Amino acid sequence: HRVDRRQRQMCIRDRYNHMYIPRDFGDPQQNFWNLVNAATLSDVAVERQVEITGPDAATFVQMLTPRNLSTCAVGQCKYVLITNAEGGVLNDPILLRLAENHFWLSLADSDILLWAQGLAFNSGLDVQICEPDVSPLQLQGPRSGEIMQSVFGDKINELRYYWFAEFELDGIPLIISRTGWSSELGYELYLRDGSRGDESVSYTHLTLPTIYSV
């Protein structure tokens, strides 16, 4: 259903991380100028999360990356490299610390879930590793701040770069972070209720473009 609807919106799809991704809507050059001058909204549900919980979660997450995470606070994001035993880079996710022993790795294209589960098996650490039902959107561009304020109110302006907070949109639980793939102002919106995710996508695709020419 979701792919068909995006096809009707002139979407070009591709495969990424074992999933279909709506890669492009219309003219690529116009999409670029929308990003630079206004804002672009991207369905990046292909960026899956690896959830790590348990009494030893913080210790285990530090095992995955050479970056020192000792100063990573609850509510903070970190850009990290996941490396193998030889120091080769397996992935470069955004790490979100949701609680003292509750982490997400927001991934690019690789099977880090399987890598982390394999590493945990003989680690001797008490951790649980799974893929939560979480699908992100990215809103990027210089007008993304005013768009987010119009939807979520002034609280969104309190978000610092590489920090996140919990929000709701029509009863749909979200985590919103001040992060993103572009060099412009931007946000990532993590939908935490897969059964209602299409409602939120419909809202942002149909309402925000009318107001802001997204």
PLM regions and their residue ranges:
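Acidic, proline/glycine-enriched N-terminal capping motif
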Residues: 5-9, 13-83, 88
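Short, acidic/polar N-cap/turn motifs at the starts of alpha helices
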Residues: 47-49, 79, 92, 134, ...
